[in-house]
């Protein structure tokens, strides 16, 4: 492989920016541009050390930057190749000059995710662990981070590898029974034993799939839409959950004329929170566009926060909102309880049915804890708090687990219906192969390229 380089820190002004190199020539290229105290060369220093010096243009001998350089020698590195990380002062100009120097001296600009891709190709991590790296970067809550970290450390991989080993052992027994039935010392694989082994695998796959709904929520967030008539407190609710002013809060109906989106961490549950324009009939063209967008995001939401005004009677528009959200997960929020009551709460609870109704005074910051509790209990039963964080959150993994379940189910049905054993072998083999795709065994190169292209440069 050639030697790659990229800036591995976010672009912009900051304390430190890092240019990362990985590959067989990383140390040689670094030696060309690095000038250390008393002529020290990076290729001769100990591995896993950080070294003070300067980056110098070898053509002009001009000092470009004062740096600290980390040297990590193969194979005990993330990519299992030699890695050099040049720690520069933050800023766009100097870090780009350093990058251009190492590229000129023989490195190639890395593609997005190429460092992690090399870790996968060199056997440092499997595909599910590589995908977990991106999940860790994108985690919006502590829970999401813990799930990604467990997957990155190989928890899911170990489980998948164990299942595959059990299937392979079963296949080997079946093969021996078919090819060498005359040997007395070969354990006979009876139908009962086959059913027991296949059922065990199926149950473990199903157990993983039961975590997928919560896992996807932790990974992708709950698409949550705040709806209600204008000036009932939707923007105040958004700001209370986000803890900063994102939307304009005024007494003028129709102030929010567009869709405002923000990620919110509610007790470890990531909400992709959308504040919509008030849904009402209006002659204002700009507001009407916002109302239409509100109706569209409403259709795509996982959770609806329907806000009502405690100080106003239930209107036809409120009732229409209840009708529009029938069959959806909603939490009804009765706001402005600091004002005189005019809302019929019994009627509201009747319209809400089994859905939670929470009373709040966002002005006085009352009722927020109850709302957060309602959100958490609606999506999580408490199992998420346990130490077992082997959650399946990746859509690709979930799809493959469903396919593996179908294959093992077909194998079980075949055994129970006395189909020829070689047909059962086909289904067992298919299950084994599909599970292997989760960790990267027998995955098409185009899929690998597509997965790693989603990473940022320098990772």
Swiss-Prot record:
GO terms for cellular component: cytosol. GO terms for biological process: tRNA methylation; tRNA wobble uridine modification. Its cofactor is K(+). It holds the Pfam family MnmE_helical. Mg(2+) binds at residues 235, 256. GTP binds at residues 231-236, 250-256, 275-278. It is an enzyme of class 3 (hydrolase). GO terms for molecular function: GTP binding; GTPase activity; metal ion binding. Its EC number is 3.6.-.-. (6S)-5-formyl-5,6,7,8-tetrahydrofolate binds at residues 20, 85, 124, 459. Homodimer. Heterotetramer of two MnmE and two MnmG subunits. Belongs to the TRAFAC class TrmE-Era-EngA-EngB-Septin-like GTPase superfamily. TrmE GTPase family. Exhibits a very high intrinsic GTPase hydrolysis rate. Involved in the addition of a carboxymethylaminomethyl (cmnm) group at the wobble position (U34) of certain tRNAs, forming tRNA-cmnm(5)s(2)U34. HAMAP family: GTPase_MnmE. This is tRNA modification GTPase MnmE. It comes from Bacillus licheniformis (strain ATCC 14580 / DSM 13 / JCM 2505 / CCUG 7422 / NBRC 12200 / NCIMB 9375 / NCTC 10341 / NRRL NRS-1264 / Gibson 46). The gene is mnmE.
């Amino acid at each position: 492989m050639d030697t790659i380089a990229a800036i591995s820190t976010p672009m912009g002004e900051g304390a430190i920016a890092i240019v990362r190199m990985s590959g067989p020539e990383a140390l040689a290229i670094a030696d060309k541009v690095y000038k250390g105290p008393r002529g020290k060369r990076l290729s001769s220093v100990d591995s896993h050390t950080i070294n003070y010096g300067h980056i110098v243009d070898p053509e002009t001998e001009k000092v470009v930057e004062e740096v600290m350089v980390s040297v990590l020698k193969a194979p005990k590195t993330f990519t299992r190749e030699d890695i050099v990380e040049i720690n520069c002062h933050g800023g766009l100009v100097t870090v780009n000059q350093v990058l251009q120097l190492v590229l000129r001296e023989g490195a190639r600009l890395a593609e997005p995710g190429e460092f992690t891709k090399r870790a996968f190709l060199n056997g440092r991590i499997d595909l599910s662990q590589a995908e977990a790296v991106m999940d860790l970067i994108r985690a919006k809550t502590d829970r999401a981070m813990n799930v990604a970290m467990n997957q990155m450390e190989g928890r899911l991989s170990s489980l998948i590898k164990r299942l595959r080993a059990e299937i392979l052992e079963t296949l080997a027994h079946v093969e021996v029974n078919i090819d060498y039935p005359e040997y007395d010392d070969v354990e006979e694989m009876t139908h009962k034993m086959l059913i027991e082994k296949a059922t065990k695998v199926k149950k473990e796959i199903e157990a993983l799939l039961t975590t997928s709904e919560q896992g996807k929520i932790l990974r992708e967030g709950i698409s949550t839409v705040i709806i209600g008539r204008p000036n009932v407190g939707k923007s105040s609710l958004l700001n209370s959950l986000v803890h900063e002013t994102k939307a304009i809060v005024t007494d003028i109906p129709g102030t929010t004329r567009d869709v405002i989106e923000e990620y919110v961490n509610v007790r470890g549950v990531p909400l992709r929170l959308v504040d919509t324009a008030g849904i009402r009939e209006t002659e204002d063209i700009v507001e009407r566009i916002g109302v239409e967008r509100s109706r569209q995001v409403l259709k795509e939401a996982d959770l609806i926060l329907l806000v009502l005004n405690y100080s106003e009677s239930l209107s036809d528009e409120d009732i229409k909102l209840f009708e529009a959200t029938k069959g959806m997960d909603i939490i009804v929020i009765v706001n402005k309880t600091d004002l005189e009551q005019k809302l019929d709460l019994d009627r509201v609870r009747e319209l809400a049915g089994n859905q939670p109704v929470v009373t709040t005074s966002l002005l006085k910051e009352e009722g927020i804890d109850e709302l957060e509790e309602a959100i958490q209990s609606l999506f999580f039963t408490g199992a998420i708090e346990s130490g077992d964080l082997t959650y399946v959150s990746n859509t690709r993994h979930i799809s493959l687990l469903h396919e593996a379940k179908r294959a093992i189910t077909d194998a079980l049905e075949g055994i129970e219906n006395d189909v020829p054993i070689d047909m059962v072998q086909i289904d067992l083999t298919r299950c084994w192969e599909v599970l292997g795709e989760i960790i990267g065994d027998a995955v098409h190169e185009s899929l690998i390229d597509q997965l790693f292209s989603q990473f940022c440069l320098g990772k």
